[in-house]
């Protein structure tokens, strides 16, 4: 026994060193440990993900103190050993840290479980809930939040950090096939969330198409991403809120979380894709909360250069019409979304004198390098100005025509958050969560 003590001491020290290294979760981000050879089809009535397929996936569970049970409500993405990224609307009704538990490394979860989790799962408490300062509970604007984990989670074979976009990467290309994951409902009116983690392939959808008359009719803002299919059938649903929308450039690239599951009309309906909070618009905010160094560790080392052929948000010149020109629709829909004016590009076939460009004298020829640099600066300046103008118009419209709270409307409402409400276990199916 005396001879074994040094060996035991060495083993204990080695384990402690490995645990210390893993606790930081500073390893490569966005890497999958396992993946399904069938490449999952959908979350709604679809394919289950394998254990370790999405190691940054987190289950946010509501904790009931009287019976110590935990009920899955939202998803989230692990940033590092201290922070989880999720949606702000998950905390509309449960704002206290002691109302929540976090489960990492899970493929299966038990709804209403009152026993400790088993390996490789890890359960943690929430130390702090950080909701975006400009989050709007009615319009769902700035639907993003961070959770401080306590004690820090340990990364390993089934738990690892996600990647976030690089500052220089810009919006992903369209068309682009991405993935969504979650434990949400597998159909629109399911009795409770899925017990197994589901994965789905979805296509990014151009924001102008998503905002067209037959789709969301301008209710998607410039800080959102639309993903799904025109015919529906594959989509996120209640209980998937806060979970990631993930894309990668090629099979050798890490997955990057480009969106946070936010809202939608129903689940898997035609021309009603899922709407996600665009993460690249909130990188500065995330860095201000978790620290710039922590953000840098989860950004890909070689960002993909932004594209101008298929931009995520199509650029349109600012309209010459004043902000008050854009009025609300005559009949307000029963589901509430922020209204964004659709700024249309004048057609190239139009020959009206009011649209003809003014003639200007020719300018002297410039070197090629100077011309390219000037065009790049003008494009960035114009795009920035257009986005600021668009957001100003949205803000003015909200002040001039304040949106009513959903409770002030009568009749059926088919707008749903992707948040799963919890109810005590019973044989009676629960209805999808309706904000009121």
UniProtKB/Swiss-Prot annotation:
Domain Peptidase S1, first and last residues per copy: 43-291
What is the annotated signal peptide range for this record? 1-19
In alphabetical order, the GO MF annotations are:
amidase activity; D-mannose binding; fucose binding; peptidase activity; serine-type endopeptidase activity; serine-type peptidase activity
The record's listing under Gene3D superfamilies reads: Trypsin-like serine proteases
InterPro entries (alphabetical): Pept_S1A_acrosin, Peptidase_S1_PA, Peptidase_S1_PA_chymotrypsin, Peptidase_S1A, Trypsin_dom, TRYPSIN_HIS, TRYPSIN_SER
Check the record and name the SUPFAM superfamilies matching this protein. Trypsin-like serine proteases
The record lists glycosylation at 22, 211
Propeptide segments, given as residue ranges: 346-436
User: In which domain of life is the source organism classified?
Assistant: Eukaryota
Q: Which UniProt keywords apply?
A: Disulfide bond, Glycoprotein, Hydrolase, Protease, Serine protease, Signal, Zymogen
Q: Name one GO biological process term.
A: acrosome reaction
Concerning its family, UniProt says: Belongs to the peptidase S1 family.
- Protein name from the UniProt record: Acrosin
Which organism does this record belong to? Mus musculus
């Amino acid at each position: 026994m005396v001879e074994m003590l040094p060996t035991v001491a060495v083993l204990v020290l080695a384990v402690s060193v490995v645990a210390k290294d893993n606790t930081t979760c500073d390893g490569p981000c966005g890497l999958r440990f396992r993946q399904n050879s069938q490449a999952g089809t959908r979350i709604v009535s679809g394919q289950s993900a394998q254990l370790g397929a999405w190691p940054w996936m987190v289950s946010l569970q509501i904790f009931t103190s009287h019976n110590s049970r935990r009920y899955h409500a939202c998803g989230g993405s692990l940033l590092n050993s201290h922070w989880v990224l999720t949606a702000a609307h998950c905390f509309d009704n449960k704002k206290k840290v002691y109302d929540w538990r976090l489960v990492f490394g899970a493929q299966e979860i038990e709804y209403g479980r009152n026993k400790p989790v088993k390996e490789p799962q890890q359960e943690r408490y929430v130390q702090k809930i950080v909701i975006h300062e400009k989050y709007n509970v009615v319009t769902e604007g700035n639907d993003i939040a961070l959770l401080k984990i306590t004690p820090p989670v340990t990364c390993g074979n089934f738990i690892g950090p996600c990647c976030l976009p690089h500052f220089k990467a810009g919006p992903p290309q369209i068309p682009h096939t991405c993935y969504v994951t979650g434990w949400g409902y597998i159909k629109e009116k399911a009795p409770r969330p899925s017990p197994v983690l589901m994965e789905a392939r979805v296509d990014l959808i151009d924001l102008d198409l998503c905002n067209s008359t037959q789709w969301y009719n301008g209710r998607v803002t410039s800080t959102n991403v639309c993903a799904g299919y025109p015919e529906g059938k594959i989509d996120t649903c209640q209980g998937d809120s806060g979970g990631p929308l993930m894309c990668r450039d090629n099979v050798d690239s890490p997955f990057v979380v480009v969106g946070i599951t936010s809202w939608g009309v129903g689940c898997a309906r035609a021309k009603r894709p899922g709407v996600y909070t665009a993460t690249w618009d909130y990188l500065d905010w995330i860095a201000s909360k978790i620290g710039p160094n922590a953000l840098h560790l989860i950004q890909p080392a070689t960002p993909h250069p932004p594209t101008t052929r298929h931009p995520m948000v199509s650029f349109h010149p600012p309209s010459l019409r004043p902000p008050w020109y854009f009025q609300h629709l005559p009949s307000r829909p029963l589901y509430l979304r922020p209204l964004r004016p659709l700024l249309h590009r004048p057609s190239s076939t139009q020959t009206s004198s009011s649209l003809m460009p003014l003639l200007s004298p020719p300018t002297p020829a410039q070197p090629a390098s100077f011309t390219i640099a000037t065009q790049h600066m003008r494009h960035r300046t114009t795009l920035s100005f257009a986005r600021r103008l668009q957001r100003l118009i949205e803000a003015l419209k909200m002040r001039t025509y304040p949106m009513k709270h959903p409770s002030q409307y009568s009749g059926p409402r088919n707008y749903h958050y992707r948040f799963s409400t919890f109810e005590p276990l019973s044989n009676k199916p629960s209805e999808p969560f309706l904000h009121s």
